Amino acid sequence: LDFIPRLLAAVPPASALLRIYEDRYRRSHGCDLNYRNLWWTPPLGPKEALALERGQIEALGLQPLVSITDHDNIEAPLLLRVLNESRDAPLSVEWTVPWRDTYFHLGIHNLPGRQAGARMSALARFTEEPREAELCGLLDWLGEDRETLVVFNHPYWNEKGTGQALQNALAEEFLSIYRTWIHALELNGLRSWRENRRVMDLAARAGLPAVSGGDRHGCEPNALINLTRSRSFSEFVAEIRFAGRSAVLVMPQYRESMSSRVLGAIVDVVRDHDGHMHGWTKWSDRVFYRCSADGEAVPLSRIFEPGREPSLIRLFVAAARLMELRGVKAAIRHVLQPAQELSL
């Protein structure tokens, strides 16, 4: 959650309150609060997320092929493969690739089952200790399996906050160097149409297809989906990787105000959800903090009793839940930017 101080910097009262908590933490622990050791997980477990995505596609009268990814681990697809209804779930991951002054995310879809563990170990080592000279060999190894798909996810998203111009330049340089091992670029359902349009232009210049992707962290199904005649995910990989064909369908929710949709995702995060696959029904069950680099990741529900969280957290949760009210939702839609106009 290292975006929190950057986000609150634009809100002076909240920023001042945050500094008070940071000073208190520093006095108590003798070190600064490391926001990289604080993170949240989506409100839906793998089973629920898969059902959500499948349901949207089936409502169109289509047969769903869904690849569920998480950052830097394949626990979700491994769990799905235990269930009868999702035994064919592809083993996929969103891999964090530190590169020069930024980091990128590559979607690695449909890893070979027998080699998935070895590949994930190698990816984790690179993320922990990146060596640029090793990246070509690692990507080449991933691509040895012809049923694996490598997607450059949201290349223009300035997640690290290094500056948009630098992010754009590094993304284009990264693609020019590793183009041989990248099979497609992602159009992301939670990024603006302006940004996705730039990604389409970049893909066209590189001679690569653009495919749909998500970053669905709430309860809204993906706003962009691929249409295909493939009957299996391996066939879909071949269609993208070797035939270079991709048809992306824009769902109605993508036309809504992006700010409104992001706020909706935040509301989903701080809402309690019964029936979570891991039993994480409270929002505080799904927010974790690691006190040290080698320490245990502990949910906030174990650190604070319900209702005894720091006032800044309680105020944030209360404000987010206020946005669930129908009148507040309507007001937000009126105040925020209008729906996106889509044009090629």
Language-model features, listed with the residues they occupy:
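Charged catalytic cores and adjacent phosphate/nucleic-acid-binding surfaces used
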Residues: 1-23, 78, 83-87, 99-116, ...
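A metal-dependent hydrolase metal-coordination microenvironment
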Residues: 1-140, 144, 189, 193-203
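Internal, conserved structured core segments that host functional sites
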Residues: 135-171
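Hydrophobic faces of well-ordered beta-strands that scaffold small-molecule active sites
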Residues: 66-67, 89-93, 150-152, 185, ...
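Short, well-ordered beta-to-alpha junction loops that form the rim of enzyme active sites
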Residues: 70-71, 153-156, 216
